[in-house]
């Protein structure tokens, strides 16, 4: 049996509208992107990890810490767009999009979202995402928290920065996406072709 190649990509941009320079923010003497990269190296299923950026400052910091980095276009509007470009340049069977602003990302979550897409019974699934229940009521109305509606079978149906679902009976269960996605190569190809 041939082993699948699984690559983790950490999109990182300097020009965030809410927090410019966030990937380089100091956390206990190291930049945030370093912490994310180190956590990703603890995931058991990733064969390689890259930081994907369009910013020379981020590249230089990554180089100084011996982190693999790939320069991408500065026209991307989402991390998944940046991931798609990386997939066109890095040959792999699966790509995992790891948020660059999650310095405490759980390596087990990375493995879990990756494992979902590796299961042979899920051969028709081209992407897998991670979500969790919202426990802090303020997150429900926070537009910085992306909410997700989940079907009874655990499939994401819709994403929104608004409070969804609307609590008709006052008993809605809210979930937030973790910004952690695993794609089969063909899933990223579909995504790239359908991005406006």
Q: Locations of the language-model features?
A:
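Residue-level signal for inorganic ion chemistry
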Residues: 33, 101, 184
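Short phosphate-binding loop-to-helix
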Residues: 50, 56-115
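Short, high-confidence coil segments that cap the C-terminus of an alpha-helix
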Residues: 46, 92, 122-125
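Conserved core of the sugar-phosphate nucleotidyltransferase
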Residues: 105-195
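N-terminal glycine-rich phosphate-binding loop and ensuing alpha1 helix
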Residues: 4-52
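Hydrophobic/aromatic residues located in beta-strands of well-ordered beta-sheets
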Residues: 8, 49-51, 95, 128, ...
């Amino acid at each position: 049996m041939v082993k699948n190649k699984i690559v983790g990509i950490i999109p990182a941009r300097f020009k965030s509208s809410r927090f410019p320079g966030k990937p380089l923010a100091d956390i206990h003497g190291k930049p945030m992107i370093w912490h994310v990269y180190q956590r990703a190296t603890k995931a058991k299923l990733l064969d390689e990890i890259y930081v994907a950026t369009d910013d020379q400052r981020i590249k230089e910091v990554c180089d100084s810490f011996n982190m693999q980095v790939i320069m991408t276009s500065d026209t991307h509007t989402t991390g998944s767009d940046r991931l798609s470009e990386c997939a066109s340049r890095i040959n792999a069977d699966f790509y995992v999009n790891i948020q660059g602003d999650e310095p405490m990302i759980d390596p087990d979550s990375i493995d879990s979202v990756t494992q979902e897409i590796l299961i042979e019974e899920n051969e028709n699934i081209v992407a897998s995402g991670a979500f969790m229940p919202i426990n802090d009521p303020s997150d429900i109305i926070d537009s910085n928290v992306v909410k997700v509606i989940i079907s009874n079978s655990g499939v994401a149906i819709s994403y929104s920065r608004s409070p969804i679902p609307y609590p008709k009976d006052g008993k809605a269960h809210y979930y937030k996406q973790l910004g952690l996605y695993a794609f089969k190569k063909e899933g990223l190809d579909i995504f790239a072709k359908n991005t406006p």
